[in-house]
A protein has these predicted regions:
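Catalytic histidine-centered segment of alpha/beta-hydrolase-like enzymes
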Residues: 325-336
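Alpha/beta-hydrolase-fold enzymes
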Residues: 165-249
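The serine-hydrolase catalytic nucleophile loop
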Residues: 85-97, 111
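N-terminal cap/lid segment of alpha/beta-hydrolase-fold proteins
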Residues: 30-73
């Protein structure tokens, strides 16, 4: 039943303009430009770690430590957040590994309700708890003998870009903030891309979620929404093809033990509506004078969010375009991801 619901919602999203243009091959995975989501490094040690957030929920992460790190000193650290609907094994581990190769202690994490982290129901949306998870990661890193607690930064990919901004506004321990292919998860749910969704259309989505709450409270099955399609056909929109190529092929597909291939990437319908009340860019200027870096592909359908955040943020700030890159390209295409820019940013600011 949930797949029928997903198909209806996907069609509605396309009609609302949430999906725009991009071009990828229809069915075969595209491994161009060094796509290497599951990259591992011989020079970096990884260990699974757990810690509690302030809601006493267990958050699970991977801690990456350069093998040649001077154990007699403390070092800067970076928390890395995965795309919305993904898990740490998708994009976040890659970024954490690559930045550890540059000498940083890094920590990728599963947001609550996703992957190995606690939270019921699975795939639930809670922007406040997501932001809290990043602060909890800073809590954890601050206890590590190799980490300088005054030199911790955050890096959010896709939806996590908006979550790290939300967290950083009220957590000054996050000394430097970077986002890659950021989605403002509040704005995209309220307005769709390019503000193509009307208030009346938004109200229909809210009403549908409220109706579903009644059904589920009465014992009905949980419904899931949005996420990535499971099959392609001639009518599949180019942006869904872009996501499909990562999430539904060996390029980036990963199903954690807490989920199933049918449910990965799909948040629950009744909780996803909470994004309507999520305004991460409000008061973004109060993060200043802590530095911010916004990275987006110049071909990315999502670039409006990085551009808007840059416009609103206080100094120091930088908006960096990756030439020829789309939104999902910056999840794993190692030849396109600007590692030098990220290394320069965090080296100077932490």
């Amino acid at each position: 039943m949930y797949m029928k619901n997903l198909n209806k919602i996907t069609k509605a999203i396309i009609m609302l303009g949430l999906l725009s243009t991009a071009s990828l091959s229809a069915f075969a995975q595209d491994m161009s430009n060094g796509a290497d989501n599951f990259y591992q490094s011989d020079s970096v040690a990884m260990q699974r770690v757990t810690f509690k957030n302030q809601y006493n929920m267990t958050v699970v992460g991977n801690l990456f430590i350069p093998k040649n790190l001077d154990k007699k000193m403390t070092h800067p650290a970076i928390v890395v957040g995965h795309p919305m609907g993904a898990v740490k094994e998708q994009s976040a581990n890659l970024y954490a590994t690559k930045m550890a190769e540059q000498g940083f202690v890094t920590l990728s994490l599963d947001l609550s309700f996703w992957g190995e982290s606690e939270g019921q129901p699975r795939n639930a949306v809670s922007p406040d708890i997501y932001a809290e998870d990043f602060s909890a990661a800073v809590d954890y890193l601050g206890t590590q003998t190799l980490v300088d607690g005054a030199r911790i930064g955050v890096l959010g990919i896709c939806g996590s870009g908006s979550f790290v901004i939300s967290a950083a506004k009220i957590d000054p321990r996050m000394k430097a903030i970077a986002t890659v292919s950021m989605y403002n998860m509040g704005a995209v749910n309220r307005h769709a891309l390019n503000h193509s969704q009307t208030v009346e259309q938004r109200k229909k989505l809210i009403a549908a979620a409220a109706k579903q709450r009644d059904l589920e409270f009465g014992g009905g099955e949980i419904e899931y929404t949005s996420g990535t399609v499971h099959q392609l056909d001639k009518d599949t929109h180019p942006i869904q093809r872009e996501f499909y190529d990562f999430y539904r092929t060996p390029r980036g597909e990963y199903t954690p033990a807490s989920s199933s291939p049918q449910l990965t990437t799909h948040p629950t319908l009744t909780s996803n509506i909470k994004f309507m009340n999520f305004y991460p860019f409000n008061d973004i200027e109060t993060i200043s004078p802590r530095p911010m870096l916004f990275i987006t592909g110049d071909k990315a359908h999502s670039k409006e969010f990085s551009e808007e955040a840059y416009r609103l943020a206080g100094e120091p700030k930088e908006l960096y375009y990756v030439k020829g890159a789309g939104h999902v390209d910056l999840y794993d295409r190692t030849a396109l991801i600007p590692w030098d820019k990220l290394t320069e940013f965090f080296s100077k600011t932490l």
